Amino acid sequence: MPSQFFGLTIASSGLSAYQAALNTTANNISNEQTKGYSRQAANLSASDALRVNAKYGSMGSGVMVNSIKQIRSEYYDTKYWQNQASLGLYETKLGYLEQIENYFIDDDTEKGFSTILNKMFNSLDTLTHPAGDTNVRQQFISDAQSFMTYFNSVATGLGQIQDSVNEEIKSTVENINAIGKKISLLNKQINVIEVQGGYANELRDQRALLIDELSSIVPTEVSEVPVTNSKHPDMQTGANYYTVKINGQKFVDTYEYSELTCVARKNTINQSDREGMYEIVWADTVNSFKAGSDSSSGSLKALFDIRDGNNSENFRGSIKGVTASTITISNPSITNVNAMTMPAEGVLTIDGKNYNYTDFTFTTDADRNVKEYTFTLENQLSSDQQAKLDGKQASIGESIDAMGVPYYLAQMNEFLRNFAGSFNDIMNSADAKDLNGNSTDYFSFFTGT
């Protein structure tokens, strides 16, 4: 006769197993609003059967809970992290581009470029009627000052945006380092629990949430590989190697992580750049992180695009001649004098190596297009260095395919140089006279600093 206690044991196992499953469901419901929480499930299996002296040979002994694990898909995690970088890139760009756009608003509530320019030319047109009226002349001068004040104000505002982005780059790097530290600590806590046979659901959720955040900042790759017994490769210890790569470079290696640091540039790259723009390097090797490269993405890439974006219009050319103290460059990318964006002193990059220059001159053809630039170097070159540089490609800054602050400032500078130059040429023409009928030769109405 079957034991009644055996039947009670089977029933008890069922009650216990489904009580655990019910508690797991309650836990899922309770954490419905918990950020980063993954749904958990109780994994059930039949208990070991008992051998019996009967025709059927064995009898089931009930049910047992093998584990309670989070339900996550590695495939969807990977896809999500890959697309997070693109989301972070465009969200960050959108925020700053809207700020830039605000400086060019021209409507009933905010007077912008077109309105101010039209007002100045209307005043100029008024001068053609009572040309000797000093009040009319003064009104034109006032409107011209307003026109210049507008551009100075926009330039100041764009510079402030560049400063703001630069500081956000620094705070973002600090956040990346903090995330790396947290992930490395969580890796250790998770392995301590799981090497003893448990499963660290909540800690894994915390780690995945950190990866979610990190992947929106920089392109992120994650790898988790079981640690096996060195003497028995098929035997897993329960621990895992967990590595994280950002921008294709190892960032977290299980319990260790590498820090990034910001280093201020010693020279400006663009003529209108603010001082102290940051570059990102690895703290241990001082190698460049290249957050703004074309292959990168994420909110950090967006910050570099806004701060340094030049629409791929940086200075480039071929080295035609080299002396101990100068480098002459022909076939330049910038042939219009008014379109020059290079700082008076800065850095030439040739074959990945930097050469500081203290000054430059240029020559033009009959059409006033620049043919060659000659840069005066800060440090003299040896004869071997001169021979190696001849015929190489040179550039100032990087070619960044984005319309950021440097691009808009360069467009403004080029417009103002052309406008002021044309206006001053008229003022210096042979027919130009002042109020007293005197020639206005060598008189510049618009000047720049």
Residue positions per predicted region:
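Structural signature of extracellular appendage/secretion-system components
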Residues: 1-449
